[in-house]
Amino acid sequence: MQHVITYDQIEIMPYKLVRLHDFKVVKTVNDHARMTFTGIIDEHRRELYVKASDEDTQIKVFVTDGNGHRHPIFRGIAMEVEEHVVNGVHYLTVEAVSHTYELDIKRHKRSFQNPGMTYNELIHKIIAPYGKAEGQDMVTDGQAIGTFVMQYDETDWEFLKRLASHFYSPLIPAVGYGVPKFYFGLPMGLDKGEIDSINYKVNKRVADYQRATENHVPGVQDQDFIQYEVESVKVLEPGYEVTFRGQKLLVSEAVTEMRESVLTHTYKLSPRSGIRPIKNYNRTIIGASIYGKVVGIHRDKVQIKFKMDEQLDQSTDFWFLYSTIYASADNTGWYCMPEENDDIRIYFPSYREEECYAMSSVKRDAPAPAATPAASPASVVSGSRASGGGGSSSSVASAPAIPATSAAQMDPRVSEDRMADPAVKTLRTKSGKEIMLAPDKILVSSGDMYILISDSEGIAINSTSNVNIVAAADMLLSAKQMQLSADKIQLMGKGNTVTLDSITEFKATEVKMN
């Protein structure tokens, strides 16, 4: 379309204008296309246009060329509709934005934990809720994300723009459609021929070049940031390729507006390498701790189901490193992993989400059920869980009270509530194995068996099974007084035996009695 277009050849739906006064459309990379116009309307339509406008009001702009052909130059949704009256004349001013804005409204918090997922699959997963929305992947070439990716308090548009920047590429809205549509990266093969213009400007974007080199954008040269600004009657879109002054250039910005009653298009043209944004990161995630539940454990890594989303592929989800108290490269340190279904936190120390790691199992008490008139105080049994990684979670059940059997009964000095005293440190597994360090004692227990080392009462060993003591060398027992109590005591050495039973027996090759 290379004909001169005037006001009468512009149609803006759904508005019927008596006369169009001002009109402007701005299209650029990495942003939504925007349109504004002001026109005179009939007095009887003013309330209809203002009051009936909402987020579903779709705006279409067509121009009709000299051959009678209609061409769409903008489609979008109304953002602001205003009517003002000057000397009895009713003016309508409308601001609209392209349909890609629908991706830029709601913020999301969700994770993508499948390293084998391709960027193209991720793009389609994000835009799937938007009906017939379309995103054309022009840059990733089927590459997999290869790591953990987090969308944290970002709109889908912000998230997609950030992902595209990791390929040093922009998002480009396609505005001629009634649904969100965009290019993920600079399109190829959209050659629109040569532009002839005797009026143009040329400038060098020195600041943008410095920013690109300081942020290590690969393959850029200072000549890539020479930009031309030309006027043309051709209708072009950002991402289109043209030839100007013998160079292949891309349209990076298109401004369409009325000048002296003629529709004029002003384009900014740049080399392809000059339209390469620096890598963008989500810096709001720095220092965030996000709760999740452990669903898998292997060596020093865990699999996590985040509580903020429901995206989890059990076969291919991501393994997070678990931060332990101490670990070193020579395989020394403290190895204590959480258990499955434990609540845990994922910590993000930097703006790179792939650098996150798991830390700190978190005890969460189950909420007590609401009391009913029929319930008695004795009809509720509450269990709690000790601190440290591992173990079953707290539970509350409506059942008759059952006497508990635990280390607290074996040793009355041990409290059932292991978090009652901050001075008492405990390490307990879900199988009931426990080490307790109190100011006045140490307790190592397993069910009904325990070893108690008490400052006041000494050492107590209690076992429901055998106690075996084996020494490869000498064993020395020394005490002021020693008492051994058993149904039968037998001492053996080199074929000699002393038996203390209902009768006392001495068996040896030689027995001397003095």
Predicted feature residues:
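Amphipathic alpha-helical and helix-coil boundary elements used as assembly
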Residues: 1-514
